[in-house]
Amino acid sequence: MIREECAGSTRSVGWARSALALVAFLPCALALAQPAVSEPALKAAIVFTLAKFTEWPAQQQPTDALSLCVVAAPEQMNAAFNALDSKLVQGRPLRVRVLGARDDLAGCHIVFASAPPARTVPGRLTVGDAPRFAETGGKVGLLTANDRVQLEVNVSAATSAGVKFSSQLLRLARVIGEQPRGGG
């Protein structure tokens, strides 16, 4: 009788271990089953991070909120940026505004556009994902290659607009134009 109780207990322990292994494995399997981050969400996250490593000229310094204007972008991109609304950047809430191609950019600290920059936007961080965006006057281009988003920073355009990037950011990017002395 003692032997039977031990045998039953061994089966219970074995079953419990199997159940425990299944419970431990299930979250991993679910995480693997979830889709990867979408390209628009990744680009929005990169722009959000860029804002943390950017310094605006004194006259354009955000006082209350930091305004990110998304100009003439596809709906998926607008939704990805709207998800960032109210998040804090440099101690200020981020305010996302979706604008048309001809809308006024007054009050925008960051301008994201999916088309090459058609006009100069002094004192603002312009970011885009159009081919050659940074080469044609934008401050930061987001290039997609081999399923990766790469940064291209136009230091000359940024310097002429009074926008400064941290040296940490510049180390992660392909730099176009002259690198400022002192690495900053």
Give the label of every model feature segment.
Residues 2-184:
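Short hydrophobic alpha-helices and adjacent helix-cap/hinge residues
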